[in-house]
């Protein structure tokens, strides 16, 4: 399986894992252990999965603070799937600079289409676009000039 496919699979699993952590308060070690026992992890970028699973809670205030200014409601009023997608994507915007912002947005939109409520992907797209403009300003500007 190609590296991009492994990353996509990790992101799909991360939305589910971050949802479990957010809604159920499940311990991260237990979440990671369940995913390893229930899935064929040879088809997953396990490093990405691990780093983001533990990185989101560790940096939660900064991550939530990245996208909250662009919300039209309180963060706690978001559906938990959209919140998981925004946290995952904001983490990547902040900490995985090697992933182009357009890829981060596209992956977030696709995750929202797959797991989120109807039309959540439009909301996710708008928020992540604003996050990219703020957090990846040089990359966005260079892309717009090209």
Describe every region a protein language model picked out.
Residues 1-114, 118-146:
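N-terminal interaction/assembly modules
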């Amino acid at each position: 399986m190609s590296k991009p496919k492994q990353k996509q699979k990790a992101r799909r699993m991360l939305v589910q894992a971050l949802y479990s952590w957010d809604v159920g308060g499940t311990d991260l070690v237990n979440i990671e252990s369940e995913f390893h026992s229930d899935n064929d992890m040879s088809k997953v970028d396990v490093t990405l999965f691990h780093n983001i699973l533990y990185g989101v809670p560790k940096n939660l205030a900064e991550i939530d603070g990245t996208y909250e200014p662009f919300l039209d409601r309180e963060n706690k009023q978001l559906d938990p799937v959209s919140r998981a997608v925004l946290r995952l994507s904001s983490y990547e915007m902040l900490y995985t600079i090697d992933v182009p912002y357009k890829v981060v947005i596209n992956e977030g939109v696709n995750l929202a289409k797959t797991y989120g409520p109807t039309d959540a992907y439009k909301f996710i797209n708008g928020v992540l676009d604003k996050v990219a403009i703020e957090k990846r300003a040089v990359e966005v500007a260079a892309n717009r000039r090209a």
